[in-house]
A protein has these predicted regions:
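Cysteine-centered motifs
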Residues: 6-11
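His/Glu-rich zincin catalytic helix
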Residues: 20-77, 81-89
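M16/MPP (pitrilysin/insulinase) zinc-metallopeptidase core fold and M16-derived inactive scaffolds
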Residues: 67, 71-123
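Low-complexity, highly charged intrinsically disordered N-terminal segments
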Residues: 172-183
């Protein structure tokens, strides 16, 4: 049986390595991997600026944990924060039309927020304060935490999400410094 060229599952792992890719020499580090994570503080950072269809988009790094220096967020907690924050942001009267995306970082040390427009970190401190207070004070059913609505609806931890959100508000957002607003 011939192997399909598009199906990694049927190929040996050794068939696909970065060394064997013809574009290897052209690959550069992506901007987020050039940030010194050994010095990065919890805070709100402009990750970069993107142009999409003639419009500027500002991706923010909402850093809730100091990378490699404190435990990462628990999967259930960050998943619940994702659901609650995304719901809050898309319902915020002032910002909902600018929200493109809210979601967790793969490293589980924070989230990404993509907003339309040329924005600075300081511009969204109040929005983040309100968002995380909403999460910290939330009671009831988690929006979208049902089999029909979510790909992993059982992976939620509301008490831990509330605890992490409160900690972020009290220790970061309520006393944020300039060092926590720029890489």
């Amino acid at each position: 049986m011939a192997r399909s060229k598009c199906c990694v599952r049927c190929c040996k792992v050794s068939d696909y390595t970065l060394q064997s890719l013809p574009i290897r020499k052209q690959m550069e580090k992506i901007p987020s991997f050039t940030i010194d994570h050994e010095r990065l503080l919890r805070g709100i950072y402009v990750s970069r600026r993107d142009q999409v269809g003639g419009e500027e988009v500002t991706p923010f790094d909402i850093r809730m944990k100091e990378p490699n220096r404190e435990p990462a967020l628990h999967q259930g907690a960050i998943h619940t924060i994702e659901h609650l924050a995304a719901t809050y942001l898309r319902n915020d009267a002032e910002w909902r039309d600018r929200v493109i995306y809210w979601g967790p970082m793969g490293c589980l040390t924070g989230c990404y927020l993509l907003l339309r427009g040329h924005l600075e970190s300081r511009d969204i401190v109040d929005l983040m304060r309100r968002t995380f207070r909403f999460v910290a004070d939330f009671e009831g059913e988690i929006p979208g935490a049902a089999p029909r609505d979510c790909g992993n609806y059982l992976l939620h931890d509301l008490p831990m999400a509330r605890w992490e959100a409160r900690k972020y508000v009290e220790e970061v957002l309520d006393c944020i410094t300039e060092a926590q607003l720029a890489y």
